[in-house]
Amino acid sequence: MTLEVHFENNGAILLNMAVEDSIVLNDTRITGFFFMGFSDVPELQTVCGLFFLVMYLAVIMNNLLLITLITLDLKLQTPMYFFLKNLSLLDLFFISVPIPNFFINSITHNNSISILGCALQVFLMASFASGEVFVLTAMSYDRYIAICSPLHYEVIMSSGNCVLMVGVSWAIGVLLGAFYTAGIFSKPFCGSIVIPQFFCDIPSLLRISCSHRLVVIYASFGIGLCLGMVCVICIVLSYFHIFSTVLKIPTNKGQSKAFATCLPHLTVFSIFLATACFVYLKSPSNTASITDRLFSVLYTVLPPALNPVIYSLRNTDVKCALRNLQQNLCSRGSLHLTVQSIGP
């Protein structure tokens, strides 16, 4: 795999990434990998596939509903909900990479994937996950400005600045995804063609990578880790100042209202960070464990599933927007029935 980065005169960055349809494994050219999955029994494979499909559809519906509410309701046209809509989009795209492919493999009992398909999974999942970290960082900065500098909020968090922060988050995510993919697939593999996972993820591919060729992989991984640590530090500092400011509010009602806007974001960030750290910071081993696959399920499914629930559970604005949407749909349905009843 080759990755070329071109810097244009106008400041634009162009990526040219090419992935070969075959790689070298133990001096033998191969064209794909095999997933280990959760079971070797065909019936259990089908059950697992259907279970994942139900979870996937539920996550998609919840995130699409939240995106629809934010888009249609005028009261939700604020920077906080703009970031939340982009977070839901990233969650939606992120979970759509591994789960549909796993469902198809479970139904067809075919656990193989091509080199191009595996590289695409690594690129997309790394891009969306990295972009989500930066969007979460932008959301913490938004809450910091709203609570610690409310008089300057409209100027600092203008629509142009919000679009810029989200655009930079997506762009950095794509760039990191390209670096990860190039680092992994630019060198030959020395292990088995069986990936001890149900999708192509970086730790599993590290298990079958040449130990003496891991310098390129760890270099690209180190860049992402450093940027991730910068994001974590920014979020921690933001909430340190937020909590210090909130505790100075004289009334309990004011403190509760301020905490209510921050705790959902902090909860989402903690879940995302905890699951990602377990999966990606764990030292790769040569033995596959069912525990690793179960935690990968939590990493790929849990944050996208819980994010809409956490943000709407105690959010009166989202609940009000949902009631308005239901009333509009019911009124349109009643009007349609009335027109049909009085028609010729």
Language-model region placement:
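Transmembrane helical core of 7TM receptor-like proteins
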Residues: M1-P344
